[in-house]
Each structure stands twice: as C-alpha cells, then as structure tokens.
Amino acid sequence: AEAEEISLSDIQEGDIVSITLDEDGNAASITVMSMEMDGQGQSGGDEQGAPGQGGPGGQSQGVDSYTAVNEYIEDTTISNETIESTGTDENAALISSGANVTLDNDTITRTSADSQGGDNSSFYGVGAAVLATDGTAYVKDGSVTTDAAGGAGLFAYGDGTVYASGTTVKTTQDTSGGVHVAGGGTLYGWDLDVETNGESSAAIRSDRGGGTMVIDGGNYVSNGVGSPAIYSTADIAVSNASLTANGSEAVCIEGLNSIHLYDCDLTGNMSDLDQNDNTWTVILYQSMSGDSEVGNSTFQMDGGSLTSENGGVFYTTNTESTITLNNVDINYNDDNEFFLQCTGNTNQRGWGQSGVNGA
C-alpha cells in the first residue's frame, strides 16, 4: 500500500501504532493497524508493517520454492469459502509478490500424513496453512485447522505480514505452531482462539530470523511436550490474553529477544524430563543452535497472573537476562523449588560449555 498522511483524529481506541526508528532515534515510519481489519492500514512512512528487530540468529537462504493450493500474487478478497490442502509439505494459501489478500470467514484446512515438518517448516513456513512471504494477509473470523507435521496455522516470513482477528486456529501434529513468525516476518492478532497439540508447537511461536508479533486478547493453549504458550526468538508483545501450556513451560525466550505481557493470565505445567537439570515455568536461555543472536533475553510482565503448576518459576542459563514484574499475582505449586535460579547447566541440552555457561 502507498503511504498516506494521517492525523491524530484518524487513530481510534484499540488501534495499534507501530513506530520504526532510524539510527538517530527519529521516527522513520509510523504505521496504524486498525482493529476494523479492513485491509486499509495507513502508513505515515515508506513501509507498512515493518519487521521488528528480534535477534535474527543464523540466517540461511530459505527454500527454492513453495507448493500451494492457492498462491495469491494480486490483491483479492476470499469470503465464506473452504480452502483445503492435502499435499505433502504444501500451503493452503500462499501470499507473495506484494499482494494484499483478505481471507474473510473462510474455513481453511491442511491435512497430510506424508509431510516432513522439520527446519523448513520452522524456519520458512513450508507446510503452513496460511503463509505470507511477500505481501499481507488479512485473516478475519473463520477457522484454520491442520493435521500435518509442520502444519503451522498462520505464518509470516520475511517480507510477509499477517493481520488476524477473531479466527480459530487449531493444530494437531509436531512442529505446528498456532501463529508463527520467522525470518523477520510480522504478525498482529486480535481475539484469536489458538490450540496446539504436538511437540515443538507453541501456541505463539517464532523461529530463526526473528520478527515481530503483537497480540491483543484471545485464548492461547498448547498441550504438547516442549510446546510453551510462547516461544520467542523474536520481539513479542501480548495484552489481555489467556496463555496456557499444559505440558510445557509457559514461556521460553532464547538469546537477544523479548516478551512483554500486559494484563495476561500465564500458566505453565512443565513435564519432568531427565535431560533437564530441573523444572521451571519461564526460561531465558541461549541454546547455541544458531536460531537466535547471543545477547540479553528480556521478560516483562505488567499486571495479570503467573501460575506455576510444576517446578520453579524463573530459570535462566547461558545468557544475560532481564526480568521485570509489576503488579503480577504469582501462584506457586506445592512443590515449588525456587522463584529465580540464575545458573550454569550440565550441558545435556547443548546449552553452552559446562562451567562457563552461567547467567
């Protein structure tokens, strides 16, 4: 979309304002994301939905091409339709070539017994139901359901941006995040209902290359082992939402990345696993996998509640970290081991070199 001039009177309560700063700290662009979800977000600068600066980690060349049931390369609106994908490692809807595509009250399904999942799905969105790589997807109401390895629900990669409002997202298999960014992608969500059931399938998920996620309202549940409510290798802000991990820690932040929570109810129930030194509810760490840049991990929570169903509360290892809490109701489990543990680790998970991987 072309840049337009707007005034303060054009901004309504509930809109999200994104400001990108230049090297001198001056505003280079200002983008207003309207809660109306009409696909007409107005920008006062050169870019719309500019990606954030989550720690990028190791960058790679991406995939040569994608396979999709429907690839949208021009502006269009699809309303009240069913989009089905049953192919191996394919997308149901792929938005590219700078297209602005509105998916309004559609039923989108992705089912495959032969899909592989893995890094191509986590890093680039191969096999996601809805994938925006170069363009903007406006997803309003409707549902997105996947039963395939690597079957993320909504995925923004690279120059892709996803706006989603009132949509139900449910994924079943492994490596299938609910809403997902990587490679600098951008995703904004309002009042979503997200549930994941596989391993490595955070309800709110990011991976190599980082990006920006801003979410307001809704319910986000992960049920799998190794599937937090939020997994951050990006800059992620969530407000007024319920965030629950039934088989994992509630939050995982890796490296130079951040999570900011405002008036959220956050719950974690991490499984006891032999490969871990102990059990926690929020972890800030550096895995050394190359998925995130080394640096300070930031967790901020303002208002709301934090409930630990198993193990300690905050655990940080092999990284610098900043944890800020303000007016948060903290609920401990009966066997709580610690509130905060800053420590090295035995390196069973490959998190740095034992003896020099403290926090």
Where do the language-model regions lie?
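Short, surface-exposed beta-edge/turn micro-motifs
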Residues: 13-16, 90, 127
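Short, flexible, surface-exposed loop segments at domain boundaries
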Residues: 1-58
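Generic N-terminal leader segments that precede the first folded domain
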Residues: 55, 85-86, 106-108
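Surface-exposed loop/turn motifs in large extracellular/passenger domains
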Residues: 61-80, 95-114, 125-146, 151, ...
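Residue-level detector of short, conserved catalytic/binding motifs and their immediate flanks
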Residues: 91, 152, 177
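Aromatic-rich beta-strand patches that line glycan-recognition/binding surfaces
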Residues: 340
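Feature marking well-ordered beta-strand scaffolds used for ligand recognition
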Residues: 117-121
